[in-house]
Amino acid sequence: MRVDLNCDLGEAFGNYSFGGDHQIIPLITSANVACGFHAGDENVMNETVKLAKAHNVAVGAHPGLPDLKGFGRRNIDISNDEIYNLMIYQLGALQGFCRIHQLKINHVKPHGALYQMGAKDREIANVIAQAVYDFDPSLVLVGLANSYLISEAKNVGLITASEVFADRRYEDDGQLVSRKESDAVITDTDEALKQVLKMVKENKVISKNNKEVTLQADTICVHGDGEHALLFVSKIREILMKEGIDIQSL
């Protein structure tokens, strides 16, 4: 049994910094690097790619909507052409920094509202997937398990990785509970660990209404901007190793 452990990183911007990237990155196998639209900038991207290489961590693109103030978590009325173009633009930016460090982008995981839009809207998911395929058909598209991001990526011919979340609660249909709700984020370490083991070992998660939902767990996400991110990552890694589960990049 194997699973990838990923984290969204490189989300500082200019003089604004948060998250414990330097402490987290040695503990994970895949880094989703912000590409400048929702967070990150040219200096942060370069430093994050360099850091990932130093720790032999797979580098993935983490493109988002152009919404720095909202951290890419607010829905924006945007056309399919704009979605396609912003995907290509951000992938190209990260590819430049990967190239100077003799690395290759390994995977793509949309951020925040763009991720949720693709998970719930088949047409948007197809646009995202097509952009990734056109940029590089060998890339892995990471998306919410059982969502349109996964099915549409497969339809266009991409390799996929179904993602589950250690620090988020689930609806009965397998979607994530909206961050607008007070109970959307899991802050208790024991609860997060229990959820992770059930998802990885049983391919199931218990929804907020106590319903058992089936899902595929190829990669586990912990949000790098979370208050307990470093603690969660270290404890998840520890318990996976204790259970004999291999932690490998996608």
From Swiss-Prot:
A GO molecular function held by the record: ATP binding
Instruction: List the Pfam families.
Output: LamB_YcsF (PF03746)
Please state what class of enzyme this protein is: hydrolase
Q: Which UniProt keywords apply?
A: ATP-binding, Hydrolase, Nucleotide-binding
Any keyword Oxidoreductase? no
EC number(s) from the headed UniProt entry: 3.5.2.9
| A single GO BP | carbohydrate metabolic process
Catalyzed reactions per annotation = 5-oxo-L-proline + ATP + 2 H2O = L-glutamate + ADP + phosphate + H(+)
**Entries under InterPro entries matching the protein:** Glyco_hydro/deAcase_b/a-brl, LamB/YcsF/PxpA-like
Superkingdom of origin = Bacteria
Q: Which HAMAP family match?
A: PxpA (MF_00691)
The protein's assembly and partners: Forms a complex composed of PxpA, PxpB and PxpC.
Described purpose of this protein according to its UniProt entry: Catalyzes the cleavage of 5-oxoproline to form L-glutamate coupled to the hydrolysis of ATP to ADP and inorganic phosphate.
Q: Which family does it belong to?
A: Belongs to the LamB/PxpA family.
Q: What is this protein identified as?
A: 5-oxoprolinase subunit A
Species: Staphylococcus aureus (strain JH9)
Gene name of the encoded protein: pxpA
